[in-house]
Regions:
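Short amphipathic alpha-helical "recognition" segments used for binding
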Residues: 6-8, 28, 44, 53
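Generic N-terminal simple sequence motifs
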Residues: 10, 41-43, 68
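Signal peptide processing junction and immediate N-terminal pro/mature segment
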Residues: 36-49
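Bacterial N-terminal signal peptides
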Residues: 25-37
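N-terminal secretory signal peptides that target proteins for export/translocation
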Residues: 1-22
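Compositionally biased regions
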Residues: 14, 26, 42-45
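Contiguous beta-sheet cores, especially beta-hairpins with glycine/small-residue-rich turns
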Residues: 46, 50-296
Length: 296
């Protein structure tokens, strides 16, 4: 609202009016001022900069995530296999705080984003191969670019089973105190308790919402151990230290993990094209080193 408009409005207020009338004039002037400010802001060629819902824009980090870092995540939405085409975007949520070597972390609920690389139907049946690549991790502060392989995948029901206590717990006791069996066979002895593998060897500890364990090789299923001997505690959520392959999904196969060419692209084979990937399906990603020839 311009100065001359305020003066004109003031002239309309009767001189010597009682307090109630004066108060109404003041309120009217305030409302007119707000309207004028809004109109001027809308017309400005340089409107105020918008920000993300988190409160500020994430910073694109130039540092790379360490090769071998495990990323436990859950699929956000149910997806029909027949709807998956090249370029289809998929989004996951990180399900446990992921500690980084520099004492930083990727926080729980960070977004893992990827896309369908290709979808190829079987020539001799109703099956289909879906190739996927996950290349971005986003949270309120950071935006990591990365390349990942797929170490393990588990159905929503397998996740539920891993979160179900082995024995009943007392009423009122926190669910995290219960003993549970991780996907792959490790036993988690509650929050703060040890995690032991099938050979009863201690591999880590239970923490709020998951586990921190030393990743183990699973040669029979095709998974390696720690990369270059860098064996540190990693966040695996509901998965065992040697979890590898497909759990609870009978008609799904991991036909290419993404550790070999094409690195960073993994392929799931579905026996029928009318199948679905349910919301809540768990994925265990692993950061890989993208060969120079594949870098864009």
């Amino acid at each position: 609202m311009k100065a001359e408009d305020y003066i004109a409005a003031m002239m309309d207020c009767p001189v010597g009016a009682n307090a109630r009338i004066v108060a109404r004039c003041v309120a009217l002037l305030g409302a007119l001022g707000l309207v004028g400010w809004a109109l001027q802001s809308a017309a400005s060629p340089h409107p105020a900069e918008t920000t993300m819902p988190f409160g500020r824009n994430p910073v694109q980090t130039s540092s790379q995530l360490p090769v071998g870092l495990i990323l436990p995540a859950r699929l956000n939405d149910t997806l029909k296999v027949k709807d998956l085409q090249k370029g289809t975007i998929l989004e996951f949520r990180v399900m446990q705080d992921i500690p980084l070597p520099d004492r930083d972390k990727i926080p729980m609920k960070s977004l893992v984003r990827g896309s369908v690389v290709n979808a190829i139907k079987d020539s001799d049946g109703p099956g289909v191969n879906i190739a996927l690549a996950f290349t971005q991790i986003v949270n309120k502060d950071q935006n990591f670019s990365t390349a990942t392989s797929l170490r393990a995948i588990a159905s929503y029901m397998a996740v539920r089973d891993a979160q179900t206590p082995l024995n009943g717990i007392d009423a009122g006791s926190p669910a995290g105190w219960a003993n549970t069996v991780q996907i792959g066979g490790d036993i988690r002895y509650g929050d703060g308790g040890p995690v032991r593998n099938r050979h009863r060897q201690r591999v880590g500890k239970g923490v709020l919402g998951g586990v921190l364990v030393h990743v183990s090789a699973n040669p029979s299923l095709g998974c390696d151990g720690p990369i270059k001997g860098e064996d540190y505690l990693q966040a695996l959520w509901v998965f065992s230290s040697d979890a590898c392959g497909v759990y609870g999904m009978k008609e799904v196969k991991l036909s290419h993990s993404g550790n070999s060419e094409p690195v960073g692209e993994f392929t799931l084979h579905f026996e029928k094209d009318d199948m679905k990937l349910d919301a809540g399906t768990a994925f265990l990603f692993e950061v890989v080193n993208l060969p120079q020839a594949q870098k864009r």
